[in-house]
């Protein structure tokens, strides 16, 4: 050892240089504890927390985002390995994370016990040098990582069905207590353990109560609903749109609607599902993307003639000229734009499958297409609820005859249509 060569050398473990885990570890704010973007500068073997039963030894970094960082830690009292979310010392991040903690506690208190297994547990929360720390059970890979590990090839229908049913159960629970997640995506759905397909929904930082909408700009773009893009007041149905996009991505291995901007996201929706109904076009935000025109077939005395006005999506050239932009046509991931074709002609799970196996696969795909059309209805008034979707043959595995409609009455849920409150019944 070094002390044998230099006997007078006094080695002290405490003087070892610490390995920084935070990407930008240059001290800038908060007495040198924070970097320039107000992230707490984390090092291996740091101790988070000061109270005796709330001390956590930092082991490794798990992730970093706009809210802050997630680190793998060990509870020094119980020896349990946990995930600690260390929030940035910025007011907007702090407020959003306090709200997340409140939502998780509300879910734990209000949700039916049979649904609790689908949500991440908030084990502890505390302040550390002006940073809010949220402590969670350490989970495994998220669904995006599962897709990536599969080389962006789709998962088998059996596993897609298993995952879809669990997410729907979680959405049933949220709908019953009138909570909207507002950021459902593959990254926010995690396996509890790597060797079991049990899922948990995480990241309630954007969540809100139905009828108390906190933000107009919600949902990650690929999973953003048409009503959010068009500025219509939204409900729990936005989570069902995100759910449909996730299920399609699990099967296809790639995002169904990978828009590069809000305009392009809406354009992809229109290509795949058609134009949204006219009542969704009345908000000011919609005028950024659509052109209003007189409806030549309008008849005041004939309800079936349509409204006084009709709408069409602006062309890319029109949109670029109006806003002085230079957006170019986006890359197409699939060889068709219609949902039926995208799903039905997607690669088979195995080469040289027997004819009867191919027939069974195509029959199941037909059922999947029908299911996706119900949860991805472009009108939130007609989109299926999680309770309805759970009864679809794709989930129940009942014989698929080619036709199905939700057998139950709609749960009441207010939504605004051009300033008037409607009830989904």
For the regions a protein language model found, what residue spans apply to each?
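Catalytic-loop of the protein kinase fold
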Residues: 175-192
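Activation segment signature within eukaryotic-like protein kinase domains
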Residues: 163-164
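Conserved catalytic-loop aspartate of Hanks-type protein kinases
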Residues: 239
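Protein kinase glycine-rich loop
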Residues: 58-65, 70
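A conserved loop-to-beta-strand element in the N-lobe of protein kinase catalytic cores
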Residues: 128-137, 144-145
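C-terminal lobe substrate-recognition/regulatory segment of protein kinase catalytic domains
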Residues: 278-371
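Glycine-rich ATP phosphate-binding loop
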Residues: 69-74, 78-89
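C-terminal intrinsically disordered, low-complexity extensions immediately downstream
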Residues: 400-425
């Amino acid at each position: 050892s070094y002390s044998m060569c230099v006997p007078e050398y006094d080695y002290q473990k405490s003087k070892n240089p610490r390995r920084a885990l935070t990407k930008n570890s240059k001290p800038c704010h908060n007495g040198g504890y924070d970097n320039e973007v107000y992230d707490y500068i984390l090092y291996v073997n740091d101790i988070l927390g000061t109270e005796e039963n709330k001390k956590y030894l930092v082991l490794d970094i798990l992730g970093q985002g706009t809210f802050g960082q997630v680190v793998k830690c060990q509870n020094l009292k119980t020896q349990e390995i946990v995930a600690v979310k260390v929030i940035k010392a910025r007011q907007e991040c702090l407020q959003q994370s306090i709200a997340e903690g409140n939502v998780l506690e509300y879910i734990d208190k209000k949700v039916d016990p049979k649904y609790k297994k689908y949500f991440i547990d908030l084990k502890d929360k505390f302040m550390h040098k002006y940073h809010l720390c949220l402590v969670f059970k350490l989970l495994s890979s998220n669904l995006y990582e599962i897709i990536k590990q599969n080389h962006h090839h789709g998962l088998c229908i059996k596993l897609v069905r298993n995952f879809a049913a669990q997410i729907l159960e979680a959405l049933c629970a949220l709908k019953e207590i009138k909570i909207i997640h507002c950021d459902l995506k593959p990254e926010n759905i995690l396996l509890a353990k790597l060797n079991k397909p049990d899922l948990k929904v995480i990241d309630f930082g954007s969540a809100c109560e139905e009828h108390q909408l906190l933000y107009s700009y919600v949902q990650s773009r690929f999973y953003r609903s048409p009503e959010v893009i068009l500025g219509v007041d939204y409900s729990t149905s936005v989570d069902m749109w995100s759910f449909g996009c996730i299920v399609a991505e699990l099967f296809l291995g790639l995002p169904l609607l990978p828009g590069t901007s809000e305009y392009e996201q809406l354009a992809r929706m229109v290509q795949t599902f058609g134009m949204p109904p006219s009542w969704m076009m009345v908000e000011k935000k919609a005028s950024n993307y659509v052109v209003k025109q007189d409806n030549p077939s309008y008849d005041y005395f004939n309800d079936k003639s349509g409204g006084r006005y009709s709408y069409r999506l602006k062309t890319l050239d029109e949109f670029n000229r109006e806003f002085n932009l230079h957006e170019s046509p986006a890359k197409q991931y699939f060889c068709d734009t219609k949902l039926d074709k995208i799903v039905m002609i997607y690669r088979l799970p195995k080469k040289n499958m027997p004819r009867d196996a191919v027939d069974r696969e195509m029959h199941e795909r037909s059922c999947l297409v029908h299911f996706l059309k119900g949860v991805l209805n472009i009108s939130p008034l007609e989109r299926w609820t999680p309770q309805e979707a759970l009864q679809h043959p794709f989930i129940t595995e009942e014989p698929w005859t080619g036709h199905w409609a939700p057998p139950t009455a709609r749960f009441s849920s207010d939504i605004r249509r051009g300033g008037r409150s409607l009830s989904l019944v």
